[in-house]
Amino acid sequence: MRDFVIVFGSSSAITNPHHHHRRCYATAPESNRKTKSNSSFTKLLPSLPQQHSPSPASVSATHSLSSHFSNVVRWIPDGSLEYYADFASKLAEDGRIEDVALIAETLAAESGANVARFASMVDYDLLSKGISSNLRQGKIESVVYTLKRIEKVGIAPLDLVDDSSVKLMRKQFRAMANSVQVEKAIDLMEILAGLGFKIKELVDPFDVVKSCVEISNPQLAIRYACLLPHTELLLCRIIHGFGKKGDMVSVMTAYEACKQILDTPNMYICRTMIDVCGLCGDYVKSRYIYEDLLKENIKPNIYVINSLMNVNSHDLGYTLKVYKNMQILDVTADMTSYNILLKTCCLAGRVDLAQDIYKEAKRMESSGLLKLDAFTYCTIIKVFADAKMWKWALKVKDDMKSVGVTPNTHTWSSLISACANAGLVEQANHLFEEMLASGCEPNSQCFNILLHACVEACQYDRAFRLFQSWKGSSVNESLYADDIVSKGRTSSPNILKNNGPGSLVNRNSNSPYIQASKRFCFKPTTATYNILLKACGTDYYRGKELMDEMKSLGLSPNQITWSTLIDMCGGSGDVEGAVRILRTMHSAGTRPDVVAYTTAIKICAENKCLKLAFSLFEEMRRYQIKPNWVTYNTLLKARSKYGSLLEVRQCLAIYQDMRNAGYKPNDHFLKELIEEWCEGVIQENGQSQDKISDQEGDNAGRPVSLLIEKVATHMQERTAGNLAIDLQGLTKIEARLVVLAVLRMIKEDYMRGDVVIDDVLIIIGTDEANTVSGKQEITVQEALVKLLRDELSLVVLPAGQRNIIQDAHCVDDADQENTKSFVSISSTRRPAILERLMVTKASLYQWLQRRK
């Protein structure tokens, strides 16, 4: 074997064997070693390329390194591997492990070199010392790539990394996993996994997954999961992490990757995926996962089915379908299944089904197959509470005690709520006392339910007495006993020491509420003060005091608080105060919601401030707050009659907006207002307005919305141009209203200076006379001719017969008589169906002059 010489700079003096010629190598001073590279050779070492995308610069550097290395290496025929092994060990001791890897790679490239013998002769202790030295300097990347390179020549990397080095690696990997370097960390861990290292010991897997979720990189998280032994568990963690973030795209990417990695569907992953669909509100995808399992003839377990029913609990029909299919698949329901079914019935308000499910669960409990828990009893009690079936709720409480299940705080809250919803304040108080006697600590919800029951029963004084006693008020504290108001009532204040039996705070220290304040810490919430605000009635100043007290406790008023305060002003007719509070919400940093705006609009409408009400409506639309049904209905009912075309157009625009938003307006109320406005056209002629109602039977069963939409369409058109009235499909009553509405619009536009420049064309229909629709069109035509000619004295001609009357500004009486005769003959003989009618411009002008 030939020997070779490598020219390195080193602080260690390497002595050749005695049969070699002695060479002297210049060494760098000790002080320079800390600031400069260890050798001139290492300056030429390229930086390690990235594993997946080596840069062109690194490739060229590697090429130049090879050419340089061939220049400094020459083989010596009588050399031995002991020298080079000793040389590599000395380099490792100096921490120059990359140079050691370069020697090993060069030996491996020489066909005559015994690489295995070289690997056995290297001092592993010195090499391990060099690796540890690099790790202490934070060179984790250099260490990993060096281990990969020397592994190719037979040096086992696991033998070089001791416990102290593992601790150093763990420290650096944890720092990288919690930063933007998580991708580099996973690249290095993939290399170490290939070398046999246990990746789980290097870093907390959950930290890596968290970092991948933060940078929205599901592929990177999947790569890391494949390095660990229990891949399925970490895959579930990945899916759940992206689900909590609401990133459904990354969730689906991770799920599809799971299906590629795993041979068969994993129930744990399927369950996690269904739960995540619920978190993201995409319940449809949860159904697809379940259906895919059934298509593959895979029976889902009880946990998958329970998750599916829970995610779809808002859909009673689908949940019951899954439950029945579970029985077909012979999957035994557990207690969680029944709890979810009860929850579904509660959301759907199906008390009957909840009773049946509860009885079935009780039957299975008596058979020893199930054990009902507190959640089951609490859920069924809530079902009865929402349905105001308080007797059934109390019966369930007795069932609980009979089987030894102790009611918890949530159970007591549901029981108190059941009586409160039914208006049984005394029974609710009795349950609260029973709760205290059992040693169960009430939460804020229990207190709030009891306060709400008092307020709903108009027991406002009692609500404030309870509130003050729960706060642990002293009997010597000055409280206003009569400064509590009912709706529309305000009383003068009296000091507590002068109070009689009706004072705010009972002096009896044995009261269970006083005892509760001593035993438990009652912390009022924003909801507590919202309830008390309702008890203030119209006393704005009392409500303002409560708001100030709430703020002093560090509680922030929410939208309900502000809306209640606005309504308080409305009760006293203070429109300006209500609007001022609405403006204060903006300055306080609380964005008004639809309830706040609707409350203010309602106050304006009730006090006949319609301009301000419509202004607030436009303002809420500018803030992109969607009106609800109450908002639209309040505005449509704000007027008892219409006075101008602008008002009609305004309300019709709101009507159309309401229908487009999916709400059903009160068509009959709006129709009556439009009828009154339209019939105003002929009031001056002394005609009765009962003409429409006389024939109301003709419109039986027809939607009123069709008429209103027709009116709204024509109200939006300009009358200055050529106007056509389309009456196709309308009855004679509806056609009458539309024509009157257009004439009213023409009149008001004329009063503002708009001149009629053309005839008005009325389109009736195109059907034949022997059809049902054709006969209806004839009836409509006759009714319109009678309205326009007899009641309004307008000239009506069949379209195309304009030449019968000369185009003049005035029509004499003879011409009027001729026209009447023509129309009368045409109506009587009916030689043909008149599809269109025309009201002449001249007669319209005369009619407008008379009206003016």
UniProtKB/Swiss-Prot annotation:
Residues 1-25 form a transit peptide. Keywords: Chloroplast, Plastid, Repeat, Transit peptide. It is found in: Plastid, Chloroplast. The keyword Plastid applies. Residues 17-60 are annotated as: Disordered. NCBIfam families: PPR (TIGR00756). This is Pentatricopeptide repeat-containing protein At5g02830, chloroplastic.
